[in-house]
């Protein structure tokens, strides 16, 4: 696939502050369970929609505050269709779900509640990556934030579902990938025979230099290696996009120092909303509900760049002499091509790694 790095950079810059996402709700067999990211909900929701960027952080398990149980637990059974509903700001029809520049895979893990809360026992039950020129995030946006799996035939008990997005618009540098995840509390009421395998630790299953974490979407590539373990062969889960995992080598990425903060700046506090309709599926009340912090709305500061922190880069090979055409690279760290743009254009610095010829 030939990727136009210039257009991707512009798209990323345009979406600078219109970017992040969290899971707002869950559907069971196409029945809306109501908002789950409220203080009395069933999702272990973070205080805002900022991503996790340090794959060794304990926040990788269920995001910030993820060790605290939610107030409710959804009752499900083997074979049920579970749909996770992602959003940027709200469930309104105008919501953009997640920035279209935030390309990457969508996955779902599952673990027994006690083990999963402690960061162990996580089993991947679904994954979508890159296939036929389309990313899983493209499909997620097209489906209005919805991504579905099927409940495996596991023994009865309480479990956590962990949907995850990895946004790779800054994945060309170490520490640049942005990970979004929450944990949804469920109680499996059917009593199946497919015991979950030992699973992996989260954090622990990813490293900052994994080919699917350190991945340059601005270079030409034909395939993408989804990080983490393989999908459990005892899972009945499929995925809504049908993308598959591949072991092809990732395109070359630029190595840079990791960001000083393990979390990218918050853009919007995760809103607490009220839901008048009662969920169609019964829920189990937890002993101590948690409070979703929304009193302070973080302020987003827009800075020029090809990604949220202004540090994304686009790699290209260009002649050292001559003039550079519109939207082509004209400068930046490790760039050795011409820095002279065609007449009527100027070489604009989007970030230290990428300068581009645009209209003056």
Curated annotation (Swiss-Prot):
GO biological process: cellulose catabolic process
Names of the cofactor(s): Cu(2+)
Residues of the signal peptide: 1-19
This protein's GO CC annotations: extracellular region
Keywords: Carbohydrate metabolism, Cellulose degradation, Copper, Disulfide bond, Glycoprotein, Metal-binding, Monooxygenase, Oxidoreductase, Polysaccharide degradation, Secreted, Signal
SUPFAM superfamilies with a match to the protein in the record: Cellulose-binding domain
Positions contributing to O2 binding: 169
Cofactor, free-text remark: Binds 1 copper ion per subunit.
Positions glycosylated per UniProt: 334
Residue span of region Disordered: 254-293
Pfam families in alphabetical order: AA9 (PF03443), CBM_1 (PF00734)
Domain comment in the entry: Has a modular structure: an endo-beta-1,4-glucanase catalytic module at the N-terminus, a linker rich in serines and threonines, and a C-terminal carbohydrate-binding module (CBM). The CBM domain is essential for binding to and subsequent oxidative degradation of polysaccharide substrate.
Its job: Lytic polysaccharide monooxygenase (LPMO) that depolymerizes crystalline and amorphous polysaccharides via the oxidation of scissile alpha- or beta-(1-4)-glycosidic bonds, yielding C4 oxidation products. Catalysis by LPMOs requires the reduction of the active-site copper from Cu(II) to Cu(I) by a reducing agent and H(2)O(2) or O(2) as a cosubstrate.
Designated name of the protein: AA9 family lytic polysaccharide monooxygenase A
Taxonomic placement: Eukaryota, Fungi, Dikarya, Ascomycota, Pezizomycotina
Gene: eglD
